[in-house]
Amino acid sequence: MQHIFAFFCTGFLGAVVGANFPNNIQIGGLFPNQQSQEHAAFRFALSQLTEPPKLLPQIDIVNISDSFEMTYRFCSQFSKGVYAIFGFYERRTVNMLTSFCGALHVCFITPSFPVDTSNQFVLQLRPELQDALISIIDHYKWQKFVYIYDADRGLSVLQKVLDTAAEKNWQVTAVNILTTTEEGYRMLFQDLEKKKERLVVVDCESERLNAILGQIIKLEKNGIGYHYILANLGFMDIDLNKFKESGANVTGFQLVNYTDTIPAKIMQQWKNSDARDHTRVDWKRPKYTSALTYDGVKVMAEAFQSLRRQRIDISRRGNAGDCLANPAVPWGQGIDIQRALQQVRFEGLTGNVQFNEKGRRTNYTLHVIEMKHDGIRKIGYWNEDDKFVPAATDAQAGGDNSSVQNRTYIVTTILEDPYVMLKKNANQFEGNDRYEGYCVELAAEIAKHVGYSYRLEIVSDGKYGARDPDTKAWNGMVGELVYGRADVAVAPLTITLVREEVIDFSKPFMSLGISIMIKKPQKSKPGVFSFLDPLAYEIWMCIVFAYIGVSVVLFLVSRFSPYEWHSEEFEEGRDQTTSDQSNEFGIFNSLWFSLGAFMQQGCDISPRSLSGRIVGGVWWFFTLIIISSYTANLAAFLTVERMVSPIESAEDLAKQTEIAYGTLEAGSTKEFFRRSKIAVFEKMWTYMKSAEPSVFVRTTEEGMIRVRKSKGKYAYLLESTMNEYIEQRKPCDTMKVGGNLDSKGYGIATPKGSALRNPVNLAVLKLNEQGLLDKLKNKWWYDKGECGSGGGDSKDKTSALSLSNVAGVFYILIGGLGLAMLVALIEFCYKSRSESKRMKGFCLIPQQSINEAIRTSTLPRNSGAGASSAGSGENGRVVSHDFPKSMQSIPCMSHSSGMPLGATGL
């Protein structure tokens, strides 16, 4: 029951509060002129409201510059019970209005110029302009200009400009023209002409601005070289017809984009509305203040509808309040209305309508418009997040493909291999046919896709483009575009920030980075024993120790294992046989077995015991892995001749002083090092700018020649694409080392706001998608290369081994053969000496002993007696020592007869 009771109570209270919300909301209006376009916009906006509550206007026509009259009308409307007031103010009355609004908690919605106030009850419909103005001045790189302003608008914009000028060292001459007469204008512009001041900012309302521009035309200060920035949100509200053919540039801001869907729809409804109330409206160019007025009415309607949905009671009961009471009594419901107004957000005539906690517009967009001799066009837009964003020429520029096609454009470029080169027989051709190269073909493809005629012209100073730090003037191809001497630049022109500020670039047609060029070092010849390189010397030592260790272990296990011993039978006499235990794995046979297994040649003996076979098996496995690994690496080590480079990276350059290094004297590479904040590059820049003699060169060709003649003592820093190209040209003595120091791209450049920018950009993207850009690079870099290797089309070729690669193997073979001959000779001498000594002893024994020896020598070689008396052989069994055949005929003297006795005679 308690829950049901609470539910009904809540519903009842909500119904009571909802019922108390007024169906009619009184709103005030303070206008300077009943016939003004703003007044008509106010009434039209009210007529378009259909949802409750209904807004009932209390409109007063007032002199907005008269503080007394403004106070009287404001208090009069407040006493009549208005919930909010819409109106205008001027510099003389703004402080009074903000003071009353803050004291009485009455919301004042205004399209007048923004003021810097903390009063949250003043809702400012007009966006602030100072940040956008500073962005445009910075965009044009103005360092010295005149600021003409109207003091009636307040000084907030001027103050912001002066503060920024102090930070950026701008030279600003501020001129107040509030009371300037026609003669004053003449003297003003004469004085500016004497000082060569042709860059002017004009900060005035539209009415006064039209008068100033009229004086500019009358005094003929609208010729080529003059540039005016209009600090006004209604560029399209101003009559600029007489500026179209004058040659002067005029830049300004447009708050309302009447080509958008919502503004176009509202303007059509307004045009078709009651002609009796809106006959004085200029439908061709409605003013931006009228659009702000329309949005202001909608802001109030949205706020009161929100309060109604929330069932917030804002009804004014009893006394409506005394405006001049002392002390002032604030209206209790004013806070609720103020919060509701600041929370409104919608898409209106002036774009996104939204307010911050101070009642100022936020998240808005301003369109930047420029007028030159060829018409009006949008050059970009500005918002609080992105600041100024340049845009390609759109429909407002009045430029189209037909205008592009109806003239011959000047394409500036630079002689640089392989981008632009004179043909060998260039004197036999004329015009563009004299040149060949990557950029020559690229320019032809771009012209074919865009559909224009062009003429190639080589830049006179032979430079890419940099700004002089003293005169601030641009040279090279960038200067040609900035000063209107060329229409397009098709060259290896790097896209950089400082260049992008004064010219426009297409999407990159080639990606690259700064690289290091050095003279190619001599290839290192392989050593005599380079066949040992696949394995480290530590591994070879371990293999030797493993070989000896395995041989010793095999010898030991063969001795200890009873299964390694076996019996051999032999005849001792005609009717008697004898058996003996033998073991084939003595120490030398063990070494021989291990060596044969390691060389994968095998041996005529094998282990018989399980322990011996385990030793042999693990040794075979070991040699299998080692030999396989060695063989896998041997080919690479024998066929590759390494070049030992003195440097491998920028870090190596920075930490040494023996090798000098430099860049192009005027170009993006030098600018990169000058602006870099990376420690290594800062160190390199410090060295380069102070090196003696200078390490900078005027052209890339000069840098290449310096590298080749320096004998490895100079490194040249340049774009990787050019480095790769030079590496493919004879005499093939330069090379690129290390990776790229940065990442950037080459782009096709056009003047700021050129009608060619968008078509050229689309053409570059299309050529990239078709693969033509890669095809052109392969053609001019690698297909025409002179060093036999290069791009992706090059095929790997197997290098033939030279004698130096395998000389060590032959040395070992020859050494082994010589060692074998030497060992054989030593064995022969040793054996001969041993037998000679033995025979001398044999000749001295008695005849009976000789006969006995002869008798025993006729027995089989391996007799039991011989085995017991002779030493053990290699395989551990007894052997008899027979006389060599050469010794069997040696004569001996008998003691009894003194006659020589030969063995054959016995």
Curated annotation (Swiss-Prot):
Record's compositionally biased regions (Low complexity): 863-872
Which membrane topology term applies here?
A: Multi-pass membrane protein
- Known catalysed reaction(s)? Ca(2+)(in) = Ca(2+)(out); Na(+)(in) = Na(+)(out); Mg(2+)(in) = Mg(2+)(out); Li(+)(in) = Li(+)(out)
Gene3D superfamilies this protein is in?
1.10.287.70, 3.40.50.2300, Periplasmic binding protein-like II (3.40.190.10)
Q: How does it assemble?
A: Homotetramer or heterotetramer of pore-forming glutamate receptor subunits; heteromeric assembly can be the result of both receptor subtype and flip-flop forms and according the composition, one partner can be dominant with respect to the fast desensitizing current component, whereas the other can determine the steady-state component. Tetramers may be formed by the dimerization of dimers. Found in a complex with GRIA2, GRIA3, GRIA4, CNIH2, CNIH3, CACNG2, CACNG3, CACNG4, CACNG5, CACNG7 and CACNG8. Interacts with HIP1 and RASGRF2. Interacts with SYNDIG1 and GRIA2.
The protein's name in its UniProt record: Glutamate receptor 1
Q: Where is this motif: PDZ-binding?
A: 903-906
Mark the transmembrane ranges. 537-557, 610-630, 806-826
Gene source species: Macaca fascicularis (Crab-eating macaque)
The positions annotated for binding L-glutamate are P492, T494, R499, S668, T669, E719
SUPFAM superfamilies in the cross-refs: Periplasmic binding protein-like I, Periplasmic binding protein-like II, Voltage-gated potassium channels
- InterPro entries from the xrefs? ANF_lig-bd_rcpt, Glu/Gly-bd, Iono_Glu_rcpt_met, Ionotropic_Glu_rcpt, Iontro_rcpt_C, Peripla_BP_I
Which CDD domains is this protein grouped with? PBP1_iGluR_AMPA_GluR1, PBP2_iGluR_AMPA_GluR1
- What does the record's free text say on domains? The M4 transmembrane segment mediates tetramerization and is required for cell surface expression.
In this chain, where does the modification Phosphoserine occur? S645, S710, S849, S863
